[in-house]
Amino acid sequence: AGAMEGIFSMEKWRSIAAGMSCLSMLFATGAVTASASDEITEIPEQSIVYWSMWEEDEPQADVIREAAEAYEEATGISVEIQWKGRGIRSLIEPALDAGEQIDLFDDDYQRMAQEHRDYLAELKGMADTVDYKKHIMPVLLEQVKNWGNGELLAMPYQPYITGVWYNKDLWEEAGLTEQDIPDTWEKLIRVCRKIKNSDSGLSAMTCDEEYVNLLYGYQLARYLGQEKVQQLIRNCTWSQIPQAKEAADDIRILFFAGYMSQSAPAQHPEGQDEVGDGEAVMVLQGSWVPNEVTEATGSDDSWGFFPWPAVKSGTDGTEGVMVGAQGFGVTKDSQMKQEAFDFAYSICTGETDMKMTDAVNSIPADTDNTQWPEVLADAVPYMKEMSKPYMWAAGLEADPDYKEQIQSELLKLTRLEETSDEFIENLSNMK
């Protein structure tokens, strides 16, 4: 019973208690007869249909399954889970358009509020009854409401911070110390050169194909600031902004000069796994990467972190950090909105949130849970010092209709199939 209380506070079930109270009143007034009460017990079991962004064999799924069992035990309402994996981003809208019954789903919280918004219910009323804003990182609440034009359309969970994650053992093997941790682009290049010239045989950096936008997005935002990156994309002024080419030159040099692994950009997750396999020292990724790499490679090396460095004469420095989360959303046509919200809330807060943190070494979503996993310890001070939250790819994906074209050109740039001039020219001609 104690464990159940930890997961489900009375406050969370206020709506259920209210429903039971109304039912008691109906019995008291004779509005429901004894025979009718017999029929009530025969009503078919209610259920919430939840489409999940996780695969059923992932550790997140284990935590969610346990939460679903606890929810059903507490309420009598089952949670029917369909494990869709990351492909949910393209599967969910056609399914809802076809009239499929889905009450709850999850995806990246920015994508939830921006791309899936027309399918989502506003959650503020339900959130206020449980004082939800007390449990959520202010920066995440501000971001998700901003994307929702003031509406709360998604409940962030499993927050992340994005920056350069490095294998501390390999860092030392290449002759580097804590004093070498770079805060400027020039110092990062110096570190890369030092690793390349060492006897270690290590690649300085690595990356996967789907994350090359992080490299260019961060570098461009360092020069311009995130807002101007979004303006550049909206107005398609690539050829008029010299920093756009400068950032492309910078990222291309990482590959051209041999600072990136020869296999980069690799097919995910082969690139990031090189850090665990003892082949590459650094990778620009989200805070899920230490856990993913450890699980995939069996490495027990320790991890360090630093923000993407500042550029000379740039607008933003290391105070600009890409942060985000996954997000639960309740569908606007659901007949089980309150129940779906209650179930999602039970995962985002309290004991289940800590179980998720422990299972995948992620940042706690509930601000009451203050203990970060040891593997992410180096990122804690930077999260606290962050004053400019960046969205995913620092604004490079601000226009959903345009992001695939940018990604395609970035792959050509990083595969050295085109020059920086050609990169800018091709992007200039795309709108």
How would you describe each model-predicted region?
Residues 39-42, 108-163, 189, 304-306:
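Hinge/lid segment of periplasmic solute-binding proteins
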Residues 46, 69-74, 78, 97, ...:
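Extracytoplasmic/periplasmic substrate-recognition and gating elements
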Residues 70-139, 173-175, 180, 274, ...:
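Extracytoplasmic "Venus flytrap"/periplasmic binding protein-like
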Residues 103, 130-171, 203, 315-320, ...:
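A structural signal for short loop-to-beta-strand junctions that line the ligand-binding cleft
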Residues 124-139, 181, 205, 223-246, ...:
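Short, solvent-exposed loop/beta-turn-alpha elements that line the ligand-binding surface or hinge
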Residues 147, 322, 360-370, 374-431:
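C-terminal capping/gating helix-and-loop segments adjacent to ligand/active sites or protein-protein/ligand interfaces
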Residues 149-157, 162, 172, 187-236:
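Extracytoplasmic/periplasmic solute-binding protein
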Residues 190-194, 233-264:
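Glycine-centered hinge/linker elements that transmit conformational signals in sensory
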